Amino acid sequence: MKGSAFAIILGLVVLCACSFAEDEQDQFASPNELLRSMFLESRHELIPEVEGRYCQKWMWTCDSERKCCEGYVCELWCKYNLG
């Protein structure tokens, strides 16, 4: 009884995983399309500053050249300053 229940559950898990993998392949035909969609979706996160440069918002990596936007603090990536 335990063996058949395990086999049924395992079969359902494999079926769901295969179905999910097919959906992901249909959504992006190539790695370039994936990168392009990531860039286009995140483009609105960049906000122009007065100096003509762009500041980084939350979850963008930051360093001495890529500054965080006002109200954010750089801790490997930009985080909202709570205090």
Swiss-Prot record:
Query: Which keywords does this Swiss-Prot/TrEMBL entry list?
Result: Amidation, Disulfide bond, Ion channel impairing toxin, Knottin, Neurotoxin, Potassium channel impairing toxin, Secreted, Signal, Toxin, Voltage-gated potassium channel impairing toxin
Superkingdom to which the source organism belongs:
Eukaryota
The principal location of this protein is secreted
Q: Which residues form the propeptide?
A: 22-53
Tissue expr: Expressed by the venom gland.
Q: Where, per the database record, does this protein carry Leucine amide?
A: L82
Annotated S-S bridges: C55-C69, C62-C74, C68-C78
Q: Which residue positions does the secretion signal occupy?
A: 1-21
Subcellular location per UniProt equals: Secreted
One Gene Ontology MF term: toxin activity
Residue ranges of coiled coil: none
Query: Which cellular component terms (GO) are annotated to the entry?
Result: extracellular region
Provide the function of this protein.
Inhibits voltage-gated potassium channels of the subtype Kv4.1/KCND1 with high affinity and shows weak effects on Kv4.2/KCND2 and Kv2.1/KCNB1 subtypes. The toxin modifies the gating behavior of the channel and may interact with the S3-S4 extracellular loop.
The note filed under miscellaneous reads:
Negative results: does not inhibit Kv1.1/KCNA1, Kv1.2/KCNA2, Kv1.3/KCNA3, Kv1.4/KCNA4 and Kv3.1/KCNC1 potassium channels.
What remark about domains does the record contain?
The presence of a 'disulfide through disulfide knot' structurally defines this protein as a knottin.
Q: Which family does it belong to?
A: Belongs to the neurotoxin 30 (phrixotoxin) family.
Know the name of this protein? Kappa-theraphotoxin-Cg2a
